Amino acid sequence: MLSEQTRSLVKATVPVLQQHGVALTSHFYRRMFEHNPELKNVFNQGHQHSGQQQQALAMAVLAYARHIDDPSPLLPVLTRVAHKHVSLGIRAEHYPIVGKHLLASIRELLGEAAGDDLIQAWAEAYGLLADTLIGIENGMYGDATSADGGWSGWRPFRVAKKEIESEEIASFYLEPSDGGALPAFKPGQYVSVKRFVAEWGLSQPRQYSLSDAPNGEYLRISVKREDAAQGKPAGRVSNLLHREVQVGDVLELSAPQGDFFLHEERDGPAVLISAGVGQTPMQAMLGQLLKRGGREVRFLHAARHGGAHAMGAKVRQLADRHPQLKVHVCYETPRAQDAIGVDYQAAGRLNLADVKGIALLPDADYYLCGPLGFMRAQRDSLRGLGVAADRIHYEVFGSHPGDD
């Protein structure tokens, strides 16, 4: 428990964090990587170069300072962070390194304003946060290790099959190199994949949703090749996977993690809403729902056009075999060869108000995944159509769709 004085000192830094938070976290990462360069193999260097990670950490530090009197509302966020940490192999021994450089960065940036009392207050606050995360993560590591077919750390997998799904998405079917069992993960979860990037001289982890239901034979990831666009550099790891990785190659994987997953204990309808590569966790959910049977399923998907639409034929075949599955696909800019009524059902952007007859079902759970703008629009649309907040489950690849 933090003292009132400690909490007051931490809260007093909120205005500074609002104004200079990104400067602080940018300085922190530069400092930490200079003194502990081995950690570059743990952190996504693409996010470092884009500034995305610095921005995310600045927002997290600010949120913690604002909630220092009662951090309990942050528990869902901390749980999400812990899942990510476990997938990256972050352990208790990493926290003192982070704390050392965070406190040093506060002192170096604030100068005389960062007196000993303030540094001590933040040391205590960081210690409490670290202990909380370590406790959550230790539980997750234990669960991953004790599960049938589970493991901790990195496990080698052989690429048994590589399948081109669209102009920009490829699927990799991965079998354990050790011939061992696989865990019954929760559909919607992800794994971290580690690949050496020669250009940087670093191993780099990336998170990819598992795109097929648990089957005991393989894990499947479906990776979008991130091309350079609008000043944004190409994705190093996704391009390496597309260009270099072939059948027979070996990839290192973490055990499945993530707090976005299908609620299998419920028996009402499930409505899966996605855009682009955001359909990958939905594919795992869809496969599991149809395998188990007994629930109405809706699969709503938005793509730019048929060339970018992955797994469309597979979903159509599933709909032909399973009458409880209804599919609605929107192409924003369909090509001449894209057949309406076959490849897609509507042109333009997905508007749930236009498909209420398909999408709105009593007692349904709604699962959303896609780009941030898409996510906010679908979430707001569902709320406007009367869907309760606790029936909407979502995952954004990148940022969280919270209010600005």
From Swiss-Prot:
GO terms for biological process: cellular response to nitrosative stress; nitric oxide catabolic process; response to toxic substance. Keywords: Detoxification, FAD, Flavoprotein, Heme, Iron, Metal-binding, NAD, NADP, Oxidoreductase, Oxygen transport, Transport. Pfam families: FAD_binding_6 (PF00970), Globin (PF00042), NAD_binding_1 (PF00175). Heme b binds at residue 85. It catalyses: 2 nitric oxide + NADPH + 2 O2 = 2 nitrate + NADP(+) + H(+); 2 nitric oxide + NADH + 2 O2 = 2 nitrate + NAD(+) + H(+). The record marks 84, 395 as: Influences the redox potential of the prosthetic heme and FAD groups. Binds 1 heme b (iron(II)-protoporphyrin IX) group per subunit. Residues 152-263 form the FAD-binding FR-type domain. Is involved in NO detoxification in an aerobic process, termed nitric oxide dioxygenase (NOD) reaction that utilizes O(2) and NAD(P)H to convert NO to nitrate, which protects the bacterium from various noxious nitrogen compounds. Therefore, plays a central role in the inducible response to nitrosative stress. This is Flavohemoprotein.
